[in-house]
């Protein structure tokens, strides 16, 4: 049986209305199985958003995330775990594909999240590049609903993680039409490789498939996840909060490390 031709338009309209009224931002965060401190990098992003008074939901569909239970298909909101006043967490490994449509898009998953967590200002969708392509592709009908999506790519200062990050950036650019990205790089403050890695990713992605590294931030995996973010990470967050949440209050207690381990 064929699907109604207007289904994509209805879905896109619903997403646009949701964004317009709730000011919710969906931020694709590319998971990387070759990094040992992915949870720390996610924590630092949450801290940076909280410093700007934004409430964050982490939708964790990464390779090491827990699987969503059957209740997620019945009442997704009941599966969201509050970690602090500013951060909530949803284990979502394997969940998005349950919302796939006939065109291969899982954009409906984003709409369901928006309905389940209307109080969230930021939704960090942590997943593999292929999953993010299905959710955020600009080549699918209704792409205008996520036209500002700019993936955050996670990596560390060793070859395997950088190679994986490069492949993910290429996939997002070619399959999803998302060539612009930010990089959050886990590296010690004294690492001599961090700057070179960012520079090489910028030049190689530009040369081979037109990728654009908009900004990057170094995050010390051994640092305190609740410390205020540095200027580099704050810039990456600010890109996603243009026009809102400009104030930066005093340090906030959002310790939630156990959930991201």
Where are these regions (language model features)?
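Short, glycine-rich nucleotide/cofactor-binding loops
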Residues: 28-38, 153-162
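Extended, low-complexity, amphipathic alpha-helical coiled-coil/linker regions that act as scaffolds
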Residues: 42-45, 67-71, 187-190
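P-loop/Walker-type NTP enzyme "switch/lid" segment
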Residues: 19-36, 54-122, 129-130, 138
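Histidine-anchored nucleotide/phosphate-binding helix
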Residues: 40-51, 166-174
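Conserved catalytic-core segment of NTP-binding enzymes
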Residues: 105-218
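Extreme N-terminal targeting and regulatory segments of eukaryotic proteins
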Residues: 9-16, 34-38, 42-47
């Amino acid at each position: 049986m064929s699907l109604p031709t207007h289904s994509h338009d209805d879905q896109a309209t619903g997403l646009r209305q949701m964004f317009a009224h709730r000011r919710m931002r969906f931020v694709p965060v590319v998971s990387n199985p070759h990094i040992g401190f992915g949870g720390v990098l996610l924590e630092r992003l949450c801290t940076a958003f909280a410093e700007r008074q934004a409430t964050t939901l982490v939708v964790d569909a990464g390779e090491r995330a827990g699987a969503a239970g059957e209740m997620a298909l019945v009442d997704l909101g009941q599966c969201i775990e509050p970690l602090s006043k500013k951060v909530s967490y949803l284990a979502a490994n394997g969940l998005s594909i349950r919302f796939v449509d006939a065109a291969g898009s899982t954009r409906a998953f984003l709409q369901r999240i928006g309905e389940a967590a209307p109080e969230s200002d930021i939704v960090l969708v942590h997943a593999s590049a292929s999953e993010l392509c299905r959710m955020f592709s600009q080549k699918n009908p209704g792409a205008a609903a996520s036209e500002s999506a700019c993936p955050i790519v996670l990596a560390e200062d060793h070859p395997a993680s950088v190679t994986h990050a490069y492949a993910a950036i290429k996939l997002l650019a070619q399959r999803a039409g998302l060539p612009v990205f930010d990089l959050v790089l886990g590296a010690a403050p004294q690492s001599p490789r961090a700057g070179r890695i960012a520079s090489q990713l910028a030049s190689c992605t530009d040369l081979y498939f037109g990728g654009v590294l908009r900004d990057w931030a170094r995050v010390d995996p051994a640092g305190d996840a609740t410390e205020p973010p540095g200027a580099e990470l704050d810039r990456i967050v600010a890109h996603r909060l243009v026009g809102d949440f400009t104030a930066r209050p005093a340090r906030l207690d959002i310790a939630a490390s156990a959930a991201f381990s």
